[in-house]
Amino acid sequence: MGKEDGFRTQKRVSTASSAAAGVLPTTMASGGVRRPPPRGRQIQKTFNNVKMTILCGFVTILVLRGTIGINFGTSDADVVNQNIIEETNRLLAEIRSDSDPTDSNEPPDSDLDLNMTYTLGPKITNWDQKRKLWLTQNPDFPSFINGKAKVLLLTGSPPKPCDNPIGDHYLLKSVKNKIDYCRIHGIEIVYNMAHLDKELAGYWAKLPMIRRLMLSHPEIEWIWWMDSDALFTDMVFEIPLSRYENHNLVIHGYPDLLFDQKSWIALNTGSFLFRNCQWSLDLLDAWAPMGPKGPIREEAGKILTANLKGRPAFEADDQSALIYLLLSQKETWMEKVFVENQYYLHGFWEGLVDKYEEMMEKYHPGLGDERWPFITHFVGCKPCGSYADYAVERCLKSMERAFNFADNQVLKLYGFGHRGLLSPKIKRIRNETTFPLKFVDRFDIRRTTPLKIEARS
């Protein structure tokens, strides 16, 4: 048929005859001379055929998996991935529980005797003299540098992961905010994630840590506790420590609410300062006995609710216990307590976060009061927990605004700022120059002179 008639197909011959003839079965022109294809091309063709076979097999497997079911022919990789997920979930469940598989030989916690007074540790006496001697013997560790008291900021969070992933993200933002402030103002910082005393968990965990830091760092003059849900929002403002020369505890509050109304919110323990001295150790010893979890804390809660105005019925918390202690033993303690309200050592978030734009328009950082709050405290939000007193979305948006409001003050030195108080993205706010030092002189917070706090009537 046409040109095809000029071709014929040779039959396969036996191996012996083929070898004898020196030919392979092929298609060739009738009567023509056989010209075998180049060896390289033949190998390439064979290789292509193998690749096509493998590809077809792979496609077939995919079709079968999609048709019969996703679990058909589960690969080893799928099994490994599933095992990783299960192991991760198991570890998270273990971490969130109170049990520790490594503590199998540890005896269970015994209930504390309600008739015994709980203590934080051995009674420390003459601490002021011992500390003074230590400072004299260790001149390389002064408690004052250039006339400025050495301060250590203590904060922290529970040792377990948050109940929701976004909570861990905001804990990270919170500690970043605190690190920025401490770096700018030459303050040391300790982030604690350990419960040093099993009996004092939750709100009370700060007490044993404060005591331990005092005794382990005699060179520190002030220990400053700050909750993880509190953010610095005035990065320029500095606490006027010289104002507290004759006091050992500085805490935000209102004397009228404390003494006249005996309110359970007269003081706030989300941010306060303790001087490293014998008086502070004695106050911690007097404060702690209401804290042990279980029957002691529950019974103490009933006493606090009965004696403090507006307090709901729940177990004893550290804030209510301190207020009750200062009221019931006023003559013993109040002389050395400074109840501060001239600036926001604690600023309740609800009345502040929606006014940040107005503050930026009218005022400037460094004021520390309602015009530009020093600290914005998200009381009741509990970003790390599974419940809160306020809507989660409202809390998270407000925390984002507070963080970015403060972060803009830090980024300004570098020529950047957030696109908006709800945006994590940043934008350039000025062009770079060949004379960068003029911006250091102008925008470096460390070169800002702190404003003097004037007493208000």
From Swiss-Prot:
It catalyses: Transfers an alpha-D-xylosyl residue from UDP-D-xylose to a glucose residue in xyloglucan, forming an alpha-(1->6)-D-xylosyl-D-glucose linkage. Residues 1-51 are cytoplasmic. InterPro entries: Glyco_trans_34, Nucleotide-diphossugar_trans. Coiled coil: none annotated. Its main location: Golgi. It comes from the Eukaryota. One of its GO terms (biological process) is xyloglucan metabolic process. GO terms for molecular function: xyloglucan 6-xylosyltransferase activity. Residues 1-40 are annotated as: Disordered. Its EC number is 2.4.2.39, 2.4.-.-. Glycans are attached at N115, N431. It is found in: Golgi apparatus membrane. It holds the Pfam family Glyco_transf_34. Probable xyloglucan xylosyltransferase involved in the biosynthesis of xyloglucan. Belongs to the glycosyltransferase 34 family. This is Probable xyloglucan 6-xylosyltransferase 3.
